[in-house]
Amino acid sequence: MELSPMATPGFLRVDFLTTVKAEAGDLQLEADPEHGGVHYRAPQEVDASKTDYFFPVAKPLPHKDLDYPWVGMNYTLGEKSYGVVQIDAPTNPRGTRWSAYRDYARFGAYPRAALKKGETLSLKYRFLISQGAIVSTELIQAEQATFTGVKPEPVTVTKLKAEGAGTPKAKK
């Protein structure tokens, strides 16, 4: 993982890289996107009523769509708000499902893959974390181009209110 401040104060770039190896036998990465993959999770004390998600498509269906190039989220913690964007790398497996709808401010990508014993899979994601609202679409696309080496097409960004799943309760 590599952390680097961005040019503007109050922003942080996190590049996440991991490699999975099928050591004991064949490995199938297939579960639900709620409980697998690479996620950002805000602290438990988040104000669930103020969580919003941003998608780079005109009519997002977050429970069904695959392979978003990125997803963004705004959340509030105490009196402060934060924005987070997760950018997917084109080298990651296609068919990636996203969990990006929970009101407790947790979202992320879950790629599906099958590995034979001894094979490896490398996954790369870039997170853009900001104080206040998420960064501009122009900055997201510039970061996406730098991270992936591919100039993205213009997008229509759609904001969706988080679904009211409620903040998970601590187990007794």
Descriptions of predicted regions:
Residues 1-31:
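Acidic, contiguous internal or C-terminal segments within carbohydrate-active enzymes
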Residues 2, 17-21, 39-41, 124-128:
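Residue-level recognition of well-ordered beta-strand positions that form the cores
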Residues 8-10, 22-23, 47-49, 128-130:
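Cell-envelope and extracellular/periplasmic
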Residues 11-15, 35, 120-122:
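A general secondary-structure signal for short beta-strands and their flanking turns/coil
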Residues 27, 49, 132-136:
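Intrinsically disordered, low-complexity acidic/polar segments
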Residues 33-117:
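Trp/Gly-enriched beta-strand surface patches
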Residues 84-168:
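Beta-strand-rich recognition/accessory modules
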Residues 170-172:
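Short, solvent-exposed mixed-charge patches
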